[in-house]
UniProtKB/Swiss-Prot annotation:
This is Small ribosomal subunit protein uS14A. HAMAP family: Ribosomal_uS14_1 (MF_00537). InterPro entries: Ribosomal_uS14, Ribosomal_uS14_bac/plastid. The keyword Cell inner membrane does not apply. The gene is rpsN.
Amino acid sequence: MAKKSKIARDAQRRAVVARYAQRRAELKRIIAAPGSSPEERAAAQQELRRQPRDASATRLRNRDAVDGRPRGYFRKFGLSRVRLRQLAHSGELPGVTKSSW
């Protein structure tokens, strides 16, 4: 189980990313657009730099939905490898069967 403070910090970051996502995408579009003037591009870069660091999606960490474990994360299930194995063996994941060949 991950520390509660780490889980809470990640949840707070997810909220900040969601709040700024639309504006960040708009600024990035202006910066990347070949038709925007150098002044517009510089202004967009400046505003992007002024936004909080936690507004960037790269600062998020994928965590297990049950206990917050940060490593061994399976995107398809939203679980860590440990929790995935535990739930699969107990039959709580529909369609997941033990491999045999």
